A protein has these predicted regions:
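Short, cationic low-complexity segments
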Residues: 125-144
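Short, small-residue-biased leader/transition segments that mark boundaries at the very start
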Residues: 1-3
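Substrate-binding/catalytic lobe of Class I Rossmann-like enzymes that use SAM or dcSAM, i.e.
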Residues: 10-120, 128-129
Length: 144
């Protein structure tokens, strides 16, 4: 089995452009893809998608923690930069948190491989349980 590869990417539900403000102030040149755009890259190269997971609510919570810590240190940040920087990042963190919470932005994790990968668990049981004592077995149609 070829080693699986993980792509972890902020994305969106449909093709589109970034907000002009984010493009100009925060992430120049960034493009959060939708899943169909990601698949267009995989398909010509015969990559097999093994798993797709959306962690948008996890990321919304992460952004909430970042915003809380940013606010607790805003005076220090402003002393190192300026008030415009603090306002921009406050808006970015709060706006992003709202976008992930509302489902306008996504956080995709796509696992793929460049060949037949049959020696893998059937379920996600291993993700939610102690894998050191895992009762789940892998199923390989070639050897089973």
């Amino acid at each position: 089995c070829a080693l699986p590869i993980l792509i972890h990417s902020i994305g969106r539900n449909r093709p589109g452009t970034m907000s002009a403000w984010i493009e100009r102030r925060i992430f120049p040149g960034a493009h959060p893809p939708c899943l169909s755009e990601m698949m267009q890259i995989f398909e010509p190269h015969s990559f097999s998608v093994l798993d797709v997971e959306n962690l948008r609510l996890h990321y919304a919570r992460t952004l909430a923690h970042w915003l809380e810590r940013f606010e607790a240190n805003a005076d220090k940040v402003e002393a190192m930069t300026d008030s415009a920087f603090v306002r921009a990042w406050r808006l970015y963190l709060a706006g992003s948190m709202a976008s992930f919470t509302a489902g306008d932005l996504q956080l995709y994790q796509v696992v793929f491989t460049n060949g037949a990968c049959n020696d893998m668990p059937w379920t996600r049981w291993r993700l939610y349980n102690d894998t050191r004592s895992s009762k789940e077995k892998t199923w390989n149609p070639v050897t089973s």
